[in-house]
């Protein structure tokens, strides 16, 4: 299974995985608007892979099969002040 990965032009560290190059027919229009102009990042074979760098490969495969796309968003930012204050209370 091949997938094509696009980088968002509007959102840092946000990627859209689709099955075919430049085929966004199954991606909701509102998502594409907020994603911005997709910038090709890479074409990747999922066959024989056990993991991906920043996404669960099984979730990616399932989403591609069921929905036709997978959206990878960055992890939430740590609130370092909150963490620091919490550590001080211990």
Curated annotation (Swiss-Prot):
InterPro entries registered for this protein in UniProt: YcgL-like_sf, YcgL_dom
YcgL domain segment(s): 1-85
Any matching Pfam family: YcgL
SUPFAM superfamilies in the record: YcgL-like
PROSITE patterns with a match to the protein in the record: YCGL
Protein name, UniProt field: YcgL domain-containing protein Spro_2755
Lineage: Bacteria, Pseudomonadati, Pseudomonadota, Gammaproteobacteria, Enterobacterales
